[in-house]
């Protein structure tokens, strides 16, 4: 029996967890860098990598599928036009996590999640 497969529940109910991840992924795609606890960033990384992989093929179907998760049209357009073209030759590993150490208040492991390559400057 395979155990411990799946995802981290982050001590939240499913709707709260989904909203948290959705907001963090949108912030990550907007700013191309995000700082939070290591556990949250592992989950954000999983979603962001899937979204970038899906956005590498710019079709109407893929745009509609990703718009179910990303409701901001500006971020969706940025993902398809600026972020995903940079990673066309890369088959995965679009993000990197840099560990920052422990947070002062509760000793939670902190980290930064950022894109491996800088997005295109489209005018």
UniProtKB/Swiss-Prot annotation:
InterPro entries given in the database record: Ribosomal_bL17 (IPR000456), Ribosomal_bL17_CS (IPR047859), Ribosomal_bL17_sf (IPR036373)
Domain of life: Bacteria
GO process terms (BP): translation
GO terms of molecular function: structural constituent of ribosome
Family affiliation: Belongs to the bacterial ribosomal protein bL17 family.
PANTHER family xrefs: LARGE RIBOSOMAL SUBUNIT PROTEIN BL17M, RIBOSOMAL PROTEIN L17
Protein name per the record: Large ribosomal subunit protein bL17
Organism: Borrelia garinii subsp. bavariensis (strain ATCC BAA-2496 / DSM 23469 / PBi) (Borreliella bavariensis)
Encoding gene, per UniProt annotation: rplQ
């Amino acid at each position: 029996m395979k155990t411990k497969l799946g995802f981290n529940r982050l001590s939240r109910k499913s709707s709260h967890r989904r909203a948290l991840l959705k907001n963090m992924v949108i912030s990550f795609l907007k700013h191309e860098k995000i700082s939070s606890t290591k556990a949250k960033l592992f989950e954000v990384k999983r979603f962001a990598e899937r979204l970038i992989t899906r956005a590498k093929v710019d079709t109407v179907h893929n745009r509609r599928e990703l718009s179910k998760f990303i409701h901001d049209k500006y971020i969706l357009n940025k993902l398809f036009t600026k972020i995903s073209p940079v990673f066309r030759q890369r088959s995965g590993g679009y993000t990197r996590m840099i560990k920052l150490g422990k947070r002062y208040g509760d000793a939670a492991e902190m980290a930064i999640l950022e894109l491996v390559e800088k997005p295109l400057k489209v005018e």
